[in-house]
Amino acid sequence: SGNFMDGRFQGVAPEAELLIVKLGNSRPNSFPKTTELMRGLTFAARTALQLSMPLVINLSFGNTYGVHDGTSLVERFLDNIAELGRCVICVGSGNEGAAGGHAAGTFNRDAQGNIPRTELAVGEYQASFSVQLWKEYTDTFRIVLQSPGGQILQLNSALDTAVRYRMEDTELLIYQGEPTPYSVRQEIYFDFLPANSYVNQGVWSFMIEPVQVEGGGYDFYLPSSSVPSVETRFFQSTPEKTLTIPSTAARVITVGAYDTYTEAYADFSGRGRNMPPSSVNIKPDFVAPGVNIKTLSPGN
């Protein structure tokens, strides 16, 4: 809490008591599971209630998997925890703003009658990775997927729950989700697996042809930027809706980053939707200095 340096350096809450919760197990090349996060939050909330103390949870944890509208199970869970006693949850907005991992569009054809095309650049030596497509469940369409070598795969909304295809040297697993009690959005999950050593390098194109459209919007997401290579990204990416989950939960305080040297929002910091000021649940709630921050190091 920054109260041990004889007044020379001081944290933002020097008289706070710290409760440190370690997530997950010691597994090589692994990350904490969502269930482990939920168990850690439950432990912290129960401890605060038992001690009759206020609780501020600092959560610098997030990923890109989900619809990003606050309706997932973990987002709802955080909303419920935030209502217990004197509890506040602060969550970082993530570092996906400039990662090129989000693309969005509508099912409408352009003025020339062409169907929308989303192009994904896959870098050299890319191992397995995934792509999420989120849409309104009531929208029906056909997807044409083109590989870097020009091979074509046509899919429609009547896709089986799970199918497997091979395109060039890439195995493609496609899963079609269903609406949940929390959301009417539907996920189509593409799992790119190398048939030999790596996924085919080059441009993969998703062309979406509308059949019957009511909502009209869709979003593509790649895994967090730490998973694919730096060259794997959408060509026409957008920084909007790049908040990592669970910073999208309604009742948490979402904190982004800005650059104090340029007095601008940090390009890497996750962003929310472009909404009018009168809207509710605008994210992030505020930003704090996040570039070239001075801090302590071991032995200093």
What are these regions (language model features)?
Residues 1-300:
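Loop-rich non-cytosolic ectodomains and luminal regions
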